Amino acid sequence: MNLLIMGLPGAGKGTQAAKIVEKFGLAHISTGDMFRAAMANQTEMGTLAKSFIDKGELVPDEVTNGIVKERLSESDITKKGFLLDGYPRTIEQAHALDEILSKLNLKLDGVINIDVDPACLVERLSGRIINRKTGETYHKVFNPPADYNEDDYYQREDDKPETVKRRLDVNIAQGHPIIEYYRNKGLVYDIEGNQDINLVFETIAKVLANLS
């Protein structure tokens, strides 16, 4: 079974990816891990990626696509299947993935899209507060400190609601065309993400049981 997992920041994608991998025994391929492994193992594409990163430049698509192809060519993929997390990020990468899978004689079975109302995500992501004295992290709504006094806590700039909203807007603009691309292929399974973590996973597990 070969899957993609998608979702906005704060939707719980990482949590659900870990649960899927544990239950279904898939190879978890996250872009960060994939880049680090390729560079550590000094693969052809990993060495090329490192040359861009060392110069502080963005890694071009063809190198990213090459790293994905290297990883999907490894022997564990045909045995286990995969869960790809964090790729593709653009329509061009989605087209490249189609070509990679075709060349490797693999096919995509489904795209798990964890769907959470952006307004809920703003509340989730912008509620983080940090104690000035202890550095401990709390959440205004979900994990408030017992002795909350506004003067004793601060918020990081990137946790402020307006910053979070801007970040989500960028992610929505980037992610929407990719989800629609796969929806048109009949591959997308929308999962209601604004519920208990275990309920979200139960829904995903039912979908995947029908796919496997």
UniProtKB/Swiss-Prot annotation:
Region (LID): 127-159
UniProt xrefs under Pfam families: ADK
Enzyme class, UniProt record, top EC level: transferase
Record keyword Kinase present: yes
Residue ranges, annotated region (NMP): 30-59
Principal subcellular localisation of the protein: cytoplasm
CDD domains on file: ADK (cd01428)
Keyword Thylakoid in annotation: no
Reaction(s) catalysed (UniProt annotation): AMP + ATP = 2 ADP
Gene Ontology cellular component annotations, sorted alphabetically: cytoplasm
Top-level division of the source organism's lineage: Bacteria
Subcellular location: Cytoplasm
Protein name as catalogued: Adenylate kinase
Species per Swiss-Prot/TrEMBL record: Streptococcus mutans serotype c (strain ATCC 700610 / UA159)
